[in-house]
Design a protein with these regions (language model features):
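Conserved catalytic core of two-metal-ion nucleotidyltransferases
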Residues: 1-25
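General N-terminal targeting signals
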Residues: 20-21, 31, 84, 95
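Conserved nucleotidyltransferase catalytic core and NTase-mimicking acidic/glycine-rich helix/loop elements
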Residues: 59-165, 170-173, 178-181
């Protein structure tokens, strides 16, 4: 894997992969535990995310991106596919899934609460579209509960009279880092 860092704090991880004879799945190297080869088929997952994103007023992809920022800021022991999988599952029945970006504060708060309530004994989740098993890398519930509480504080600042925008922004930055929200 090659890491490509950018000055804004975003880092891309580039992994070589090889298209298999079925023209839909890929084989890629896994450097963990002495090395091995793994196979993935991302197209059904991409299609499922695209379909659900369209069904929820294009709120799924921003949620995935925000939660990846949170994962990186808090060094949460979960992979990107698990972030996407959990976001996908959460937004399916979320009451504000079709609202505008003005509800992102509530969406983040409610997602943190939903994640905090995930069973700590659960070892894997099924990825959208492909159904492949996505394994957790460690417990994430404690950090999720902490960020849920911080999001409550941020929303309290946002809804105060008069509104305390600077304080709210500082709380959101405590969760997502200084590049969010801008």
């Amino acid at each position: 894997m090659i890491q490509v860092p950018f000055t804004d704090g975003i880092t891309f991880e580039v992994v070589p992969c090889f298209l298999n004879k079925d023209n839909s799945s890929y084989t890629y190297p896994n450097a963990n535990d002495g090395g091995s080869w793994k196979t993935t088929n991302p197209r059904p997952e991409m299609d499922a995310i695209r379909t659900r994103n369209a069904a929820c007023n294009c709120n799924l992809v921003p949620l995935c991106r925000m939660m990846r920022s949170w994962k990186n800021k808090w060094t949460v022991p979960i992979g990107g596919l698990l972030v996407d999988t959990l976001s996908y599952q959460f937004i399916e029945n979320y009451e504000h899934r079709e609202k505008s970006y003005l509800y992102y504060d509530f969406m983040c708060r409610d997602f943190f609460k939903w994640m905090a309530d995930q069973d700590e004994e659960q070892e894997f989740w099924k990825a959208p579209g492909s159904g492949q098993y996505v394994y957790g890398k460690g417990l994430f519930q404690y950090k999720t509960k902490r960020c849920y509480n911080i999001s409550l504080e941020a929303i309290t600042h946002e809804t105060a009279n008069p509104k305390q925008e600077w304080s709210a922004k500082q709380k959101w930055r405590e969760i997502f880092g200084t590049t969010f929200p801008d």
